[in-house]
Amino acid sequence: MKKRISVREGNSGILHIRHEDATEERHIPSYDLDEARHLLLRFQELRDGEGSYLKDNYWCEGTNWLPTVVNYLYGRIFGNYVRYRPLLKQLIDGELEVALENQGELATIVDILEGQGDGRFLKPHLFNGLMLFNNWLTVRRYRAEVLFFRFTPDDFRTTAAKSTLDELGVRYMEALGVSKRLLLTNVFRRKPYYFYGGVPIENSFGLDYDLSGVDKYTAVLFTAALRRIEWMISAYIREQKWHVRALNSSEFKTFYGIDDTQVIFPLLYACQQQQIHTVAHQHGAAYNKYHASYVMEGINGTEYRWFDKLITWGEFWRDRLLAVSEVYSPDRIVVGCDLFEPRHVSRNERTEGRRNILIPYEYLANTYAVGRYITKLMDLGYSVFFKQRPDESLEDQIDTYCLPIGYPERLTIIEEITPRAMENIDIVAGTASTLIYQLLIYGKVTWFLETDYKYMEDLVELGHARLVRYEDLETLDDSYFEPTDADPKYLFSSETLRDTLQKHVLAGEA
């Protein structure tokens, strides 16, 4: 008999499940990044009836489009399948019926497995036509020298860059991810917004591959993944052509934005076709072996097109990217300023005997496991400081850690990192946040908390953090409280954001 459950997903992917008999349980996802990587590589190596590899079958007009969906495959499809595999197997077997109370990562993978979302949209031709018309009209009405890529009008990742461009008096136009609301609003309250991200209309490929070597669950997964990415690639190819037409009469000299590896390819390739110089700016600590779309494992470097130039925060990041991937040319990677403002600070000595530990919110991490660390640290007498993220509600962020009653109230909330706030901190700990790297310059004790989410374990491998296990918290010796010895100048350039933009964004191809 088919079971029926109702599921609410928390911000970090933890599922709150309610059964038909009103009992409730919590499902903690699996965060096995190695398994997601294994599925990605196996998928890329599938062969069609003629023996051609899947990764070689999506060329169009001189471009291999398969790399444009690697991020989606790894994170949204294979990563989510690994996260929720026990439930998804029951779903595939027809033993489970799921009512989703909200949209999240489970909803994404369920839709993919059920073939939902492939070309389903209210009047897609009309929507795409409106986007194309908006872009064509905007380019002609508003002249600008820089096309500035952002996810949304209030994207915190690019706030500092936007302010600096304003201070420099640069004529720029924002390129934003399209949505029905934003597009329709802009039709009537016209702003100089250029949109990217059209709606899929049809699958131009429909290729078949040999799945005889995989189990039935993997076969279902690969079939669904194939269907989804073929829709995406088909849409990307069409979107690129729309952008080429819209940009025909533009005056853009430079296309600039964060180092995205998913949504930006159609506009990026169109800019390159129109001889517009393209520059990416590092936005996070993603240059490690577990970020598939920066590593591009199994992809030939000569077949991967990305930005003409990449600005990294420091020599450390340039070296890391070149160490974990073979698809990048060293002469296209330069060192500039951190997108989140310069971070050179004076270090202060740790106060003897004080146990103030800073743990930042990490929505991609195993927050349940980190919550156990927080609880035990409090029980051991540590004062836990929690750095909240600016784009989610504080209550929702804390809720992801599943803390016992009474423990959330004991957290000291930090809204913004400042030198003064860091004077109160002795230890910085986490598993996945860019902030852990950014705080190395303060010379604090740095801990990498052991969980099944190993995204930033290179912190330990490079000697920038101590690996701390939950079962060892009560018996840590003095070596665990030695401050981190990392060279701030190697991690983060002393150059200002203003100088970086003038040198690498506003100076053409220099």
Where are these regions (language model features)?
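Catalytic-core helical/loop segments in enzymes performing group transfer/polymerization on anionic/lipid-linked
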Residues: 1-510
